[in-house]
C-alpha cells in the first residue's frame, strides 16, 4: 500500500466498504499473535496514533520504532532495518519517511507488507482513503462532484494522492494556490482563483502551509496568506449550500482557515480524523492475510 496509483476503483470501493463497516461498529480481532511495527521518521500525531488505535482494535501487537533510539543512528539503512524486523517475526511495517518514494529501494526486496504513512512530498494513500470515506459519507458518490484543493499544492502529498484518486472516481479537481506553490506536474486538476471556486465547489479541501519545508515562516507573511489564500469567514459565507470544509491537519488556525471555522457546521475536519482509524483498520485487515497465507487466510474473526 504505497500509492493510490496501485489501487483500482474496485479495490478502493472494497477498502471503503470495509472502513464503513468498522465505522458502523463491526469488530474484528486476530486469531493469532501478529506483530506490526510503526516506523515514523517524521513527526506525526494523527497518522501515527490512528494507525496504533487501528492496530490495537484489530488485536495486533504493536512495535513503535524510535529512529533516535535505533541503529539508524549508527548508519543502518532503511532496508536493513526492515529486514531485521522481518527476521524477528514482524508481519507488516507502517512507514512515514521524509524521502520521496523511499519505498522504491524496498519493493520486491522484502517479504512483508509496507503501508506508506506518507513519503516526503510524494504520497499519502491512507490520508486519501480517509478523505474519500468522508466525502462518500457526505454525498454518497464521487461522480460529478467539484473539489477545490487549496494551498501549498507543490509540497503536498495529500494533494497528489487526492487529485489522482478523485479524478479516477469521476470528480472534477480544481487547484487554488499562490504562484510559487503551484505544482505544474500535477495534471489532475485545473488552476483557478480561490474566489471563483468558493461558490462553485462541493468540497473545499484546504492544505497545511508546511513551514518545515520553507525557508521563512513569519507571522506577517502568514496573515497575508490568510487574507489572500485562506478560508476566511467572509469566503465561507459565500460557499455553496451543502458544501463541506476539509483539512488533513494539523491546522494552522487563522492561516489556512479562520479559527472559528475549524469546528463550524460545514467542517468535517475532526470527522476525517475519526475516519482515519476505520480506514487504517481496513487497510491493515487487507494487507496482513496476504503475507499469512493469502486473502482466504482466516487471520481475523
UniProtKB/Swiss-Prot annotation:
Pfam families in UniProt: OTCace, OTCace_N
Gene3D superfamilies: Aspartate/ornithine carbamoyltransferase
Reactions mediated catalytically: carbamoyl phosphate + L-aspartate = N-carbamoyl-L-aspartate + phosphate + H(+)
Enzyme nomenclature, EC number: 2.1.3.2
Keywords: Pyrimidine biosynthesis, Transferase
PROSITE patterns per the UniProt record, alphabetical: CARBAMOYLTRANSFERASE (PS00097)
Keyword Amino-acid biosynthesis found: no
Residues annotated as signal peptide: none
Superkingdom as given in the UniProt entry: Bacteria
One of the GO BP terms on file: 'de novo' UMP biosynthetic process
Pathway(s) where this gene product acts: Pyrimidine metabolism; UMP biosynthesis via de novo pathway; (S)-dihydroorotate from bicarbonate: step 2/3
Binding site residues for carbamoyl phosphate: 46-47, 96, 124, 127, 249-250
Residue positions binding L-aspartate: 74, 157, 208
Molecular function terms from GO: amino acid binding; aspartate carbamoyltransferase activity
Family the UniProt entry places it in: Belongs to the aspartate/ornithine carbamoyltransferase superfamily. ATCase family.
Subunit structure and binding partners: Heterododecamer (2C3:3R2) of six catalytic PyrB chains organized as two trimers (C3), and six regulatory PyrI chains organized as three dimers (R2).
UniProt function note: Catalyzes the condensation of carbamoyl phosphate and aspartate to form carbamoyl aspartate and inorganic phosphate, the committed step in the de novo pyrimidine nucleotide biosynthesis pathway.
Protein name, per record: Aspartate carbamoyltransferase catalytic subunit
The organism of origin for this protein: Bacillus cereus (strain ATCC 14579 / DSM 31 / CCUG 7414 / JCM 2152 / NBRC 15305 / NCIMB 9373 / NCTC 2599 / NRRL B-3711)
Amino acid at each position: 500500500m504505497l500509492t493510490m496509483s496501485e489501487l483500482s476503483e474496485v479495490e478502493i470501493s472494497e477498502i471503503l466498504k470495509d472502513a464503513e463497516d468498522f465505522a458502523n461498529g463491526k469488530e474484528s480481532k486476530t486469531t493469532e499473535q501478529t506483530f506490526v511495527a510503526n516506523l515514523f521518521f517524521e513527526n506525526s500525531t494523527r497518522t501515527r496514533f490512528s494507525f496504533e488505535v487501528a492496530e490495537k482494535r484489530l488485536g495486533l501487537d504493536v512495535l513503535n520504532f524510535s529512529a533516535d533510539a535505533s541503529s539508524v543512528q549508527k548508519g543502518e539503512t532503511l532496508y536493513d532495518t526492515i529486514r531485521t524486523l522481518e527476521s524477528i517475526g514482524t508481519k507488516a511495517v507502517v512507514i512515514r519517511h521524509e524521502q520521496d518514494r523511499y519505498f522504491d529501494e524496498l519493493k520486491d526486496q522484502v517479504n512483508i507488507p509496507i503501508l506508506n504513512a506518507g513519503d516526503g512530498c510524494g504520497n499519502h494513500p491512507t490520508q486519501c482513503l480517509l478523505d474519500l470515506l468522508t466525502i462518500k459519507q457526505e454525498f454518497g458518490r464521487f461522480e460529478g462532484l467539484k473539489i477545490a484543493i487549496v494551498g501549498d499544492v507543490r509540497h503536498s502529498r495529500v494533494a497528489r494522492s487526492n487529485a489522482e484518486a478523485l479524478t479516477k472516481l469521476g470528480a472534477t479537481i480544481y487547484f487554488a494556490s499562490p504562484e510559487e506553490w503551484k505544482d505544474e506536474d500535477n495534471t489532475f486538476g485545473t488552476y483557478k482563483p480561490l474566489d471563483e471556486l468558493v461558490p462553485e465547489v462541493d468540497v473545499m479541501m484546504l492544505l497545511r502551509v508546511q513551514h518545515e519545508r520553507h525557508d521563512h515562516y513569519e507571522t506577517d507573511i502568514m496573515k497575508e496568506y490568510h487574507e489572500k489564500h485562506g478560508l476566511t469567514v467572509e469566503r465561507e459565507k459565500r460557499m455553496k449550500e451543502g458544501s463541506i470544509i476539509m483539512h488533513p491537519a494539523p491546522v494552522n488556525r487563522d492561516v489556512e482557515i479562520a479559527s472559528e471555522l475549524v469546528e463550524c457546521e460545514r467542517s468535517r475536519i475532526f470527522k476525517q480524523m475519526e475516519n482515519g482509524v476505520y480506514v487504517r483498520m481496513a487497510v491493515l485487515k487487507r494487507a496482513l492475510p496476504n503475507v499469512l497465507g493469502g486473502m482466504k487466510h482466516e487471520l481475523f474473526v
